[in-house]
Amino acid sequence: EVTEFANLENTGITIDENPVLKYKDPMGNEFHFVRTYKPVCHDYPYYLPIMNKYYSDFDMAGLVTWHEGQNAPDKVLTVHSTGDVDSGNFGAAEPAYIRNLLLAMEKNRAEAGLDSFRVVTEATHWSGMMYNGGHPELIPEYKVPIIDIEIGSTTESWSDGAAAKAMAKSLFSIFKGDGKKLYSILCVGGVHFEPAFVNAVLQTEGDKAFAISHIIPNQWLVSGKYEEPEGMEKLKKCVETINGGIKGIAFHDGLKGMYKDQMRTLAKEYNIPAFKHQLLRRPNDIAWIE
């Protein structure tokens, strides 16, 4: 669908017997489009060397694919950062670009009249674990910020041409910010498709805006034993992968006390506020440390 919005040129690179195409926008931003045999995370040992060979110096990488899963919501345009929360292996993340993409997806969804679709974020994860695509320790070996960009979660949604076009058009806006002062936050707790975190991006008013990247849901805090000392080390590793660091930690109010305590300890370590998710609706009430 990207060919509807840009004139693509051949780069001279071939991956999986497919030519890699490129587009340079009026601002000089260059986009490469790579068609692969299978989703990259399904065979990381194969694709990681290719990514590092051709795209180790790029600013952002996006894996455009479909979303599915048991009890997964349908008619969604979704974005998530990469990482295996249980083991504490996180990919690089760029909050500003994720925010730009989410805003563009919401704008294009509305303009296309896709009233039955919603823009959502998912908890940080890596589908390589599900598809035996490699060991999670491979994730940090790709240093470029990387996200999954998906349409879900049924064949009807996957074949929806208007949704595909809205998503494709959004890709070209990933470097286009709106000039607001951004507050990058680590999001912790809640469910896999936690609405509080994406709403913080889509519904922020005024000159202060939230940017999100890694989202650690309640279920993987528990299975990853994040209440233990090793859990704190995993949290620090997570923060260190976020470009520009973080300005605060938003935790879901439903978290158990021991996890809230961990977030407050982590916040003290970085000299930033930790706050309940309800405050995401009132950014001016947060005790930011400028």
Where are these regions (language model features)?
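N-terminal catalytic or cofactor-binding beta/alpha core of small enzyme domains
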Residues: 1-143, 154-155, 161-165, 169-197, ...
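Acidic, Ser/Thr-rich peripheral helices and adjacent loops at domain boundaries
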Residues: 201-219
